[in-house]
Amino acid sequence: NIVDVPCRDDYYRDSDGNCVCCKFGGA
């Protein structure tokens, strides 16, 4: 089950709802 909590500011949510590093340093 996906818990709807905020990701860290530099993370993004992937298609599975996981917080993934790092939205400012990749594609």
From Swiss-Prot:
MF GO annotations: potassium channel regulator activity; toxin activity
Cell compartment(s), UniProt: Secreted; Nematocyst
GO CC terms in record: extracellular region; nematocyst
Keyword annotations from UniProtKB, A to Z: Ion channel impairing toxin, Nematocyst, Potassium channel impairing toxin, Secreted, Toxin, Voltage-gated potassium channel impairing toxin
Biological role stated in the UniProt entry: Possible voltage-gated potassium channel (Kv) blocker.
Family the entry assigns: Belongs to the sea anemone BBH family.
Protein name from the UniProt record: Toxin Bcg III 21.00
